[in-house]
């Protein structure tokens, strides 16, 4: 739907145009008009908007630091709060209603859209549960609504299911909220949705679980049968851990045990001879040749340098695979000390994530994209917190600012901003799905 309006306005006069819209229909649009803009001036709306933003951003009172750091902090918090978008409206009685992008019908309740959980499960939603729990409550209800209307949980809503990125990170959102006391949604229906998400494939590769049959049979997703197979395996293992935690918390021991076992599948792709996560084919053979700096192929927007750390749910298990805390610490050190070399791999050209890693000049650490953003904090789990402190401060002070070039890469629905907000406050949700930062 589009419209073109032309006005004949005498020189020197001002024209005020008030517009309202609705995804539901004309009647709802007029309701929105009366509530939001009728008889209001631009100045009135500016004041209302300022009050609303202050009420949200004022929940965190930053102290210390200089003016530039304050500007950067609140600029990042502003970006965190831009997504996901509210896709619901209020009917005559003031109750929430929405047009569903999944079944095309009007429903009572809440709906959200424009959010890629592959990015935002890491820090955005854990920040919501802590500072904006009422937002998390509505998002959890919306996730269950999405499942009931489409048969799947969303992984990248835009406005409905979109074939983008990988993983079952909706399971992380639900588990993290539940474990932190946000329980105003149907837990049994949520568990049903979570299990189904791991045992079916939607029309888009990112909806459901791509390669779930092979994952269950082999203990990993084989490559090259499936693109991004190693990254998928690692993300599935984490999601299985989330599902196990959620099932156990509501008393479903049998499901919890099944998925706890699956959560250990990450071990199947660790090669002790080189200390990296690698790809295997369906016969269990390592894919050769292996180059830790090669992007794409079995990985998503990264290389083995970035995904080897994607075991947020079992850091001690990963350390054991590497030979212990000292060896894991040395491996982390080498990520920062290695040259920023790369092989474009299956991408065939230098994607912007590669260019950003090189420009950041932090070795193989690629803060400009999401998969490795938690890795700095792993030092805290192996008895070397001073190294985490050093690198966190380096990233805070060198890779962010309040200007137009204030980000070092993808900001992605607030995730890179949420990293700054959490880290500036002195904590980070390394493993969403447990009440720990």
Placement of each model-derived feature along the sequence:
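Active-site core of glycosidic bond-cleaving carbohydrate-active enzymes
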Residues: 107-132, 171, 181-437
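A residue-level signal for conserved active-site and pocket-lining positions in enzyme catalytic cores
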Residues: 12, 76, 174, 315, ...
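Glycine-rich phosphate/pyrophosphate-binding loops
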Residues: 133-151, 431-434
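Mobile, glycine-rich extracellular loop/lid and propeptide segments
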Residues: 121, 136-141, 146, 161-166, ...
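N-terminal catalytic cores of secreted or lumenal carbohydrate-active enzymes
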Residues: 71, 158-178, 182
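Primarily short, surface-exposed interaction patches in extracytoplasmic proteins
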Residues: 76, 143-158, 247
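Acidic/polar, glycine-enriched structural segments that form the non-catalytic walls/loops
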Residues: 1-111, 152-155, 184, 188, ...
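Amphipathic, well-ordered alpha-helical segments in soluble domains
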Residues: 52, 56, 139, 239-242, ...
